[in-house]
Regions:
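Short amphipathic
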Residues: 3-10
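Active-site His/Glu-centered metal-binding helix of metallohydrolases
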Residues: 42, 46, 50
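A short glycine/serine-rich beta->alpha loop
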Residues: 27-37, 65-70
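Single conserved hydrophobic/aromatic residue that forms the stacking wall/gate
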Residues: 98-112
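Acidic-glycine-rich active-site phosphate/pyrophosphate-binding loop
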Residues: 11-26
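Histidine-centered active-site/metal-ligand motif
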Residues: 12, 36, 44, 99
Length: 112
């Protein structure tokens, strides 16, 4: 079995008047992430890691922020399309490990 490893990294600024999406889940918060799509940094990083492992460039190449069709798109669609690209190229996903960090501005989320 051949193993390939990819690393994904994504950053978006926290801004008011945007929804906050992480991993396809809407998080109740006063701020959201700025971006052309829904700005889900977690899914974007996963897409980059998968595409990188397959040597298929990056998310910006396949889903450019200059294309109107991706304006405010649900990033789960981008992940689905990324997985289709990988399957079409003969790849399967074995394992995904995820680390989320926000070093400059703590993101406090409480669950009651």
């Amino acid at each position: 079995m051949k193993v390939r490893v990819g690393f994904g990294y994504d950053v978006h600024a926290l801004v008011p008047e945007r929804d906050l999406w992480l991993g396809g889940v809407k998080i109740e918060h006063t701020m959201g992430l700025q971006g052309h799509s829904d700005a889900d940094v977690l899914i974007h990083a996963i897409c980059d890691a998968l595409l990188g492992a397959a040597n298929m460039r990056d998310i910006g190449y396949h889903f450019p922020d200059t294309a109107g069709e991706y304006k405010d798109i649900d990033s789960k669609i981008l992940l689905f399309d990324t997985m289709e690209l990988l399957r079409d190229a003969g790849y399967t996903l074995g394992l995904t490990l995820i680390h989320i960090s926000e070093p400059t501005r703590p993101l406090y989320i409480s669950y009651a």
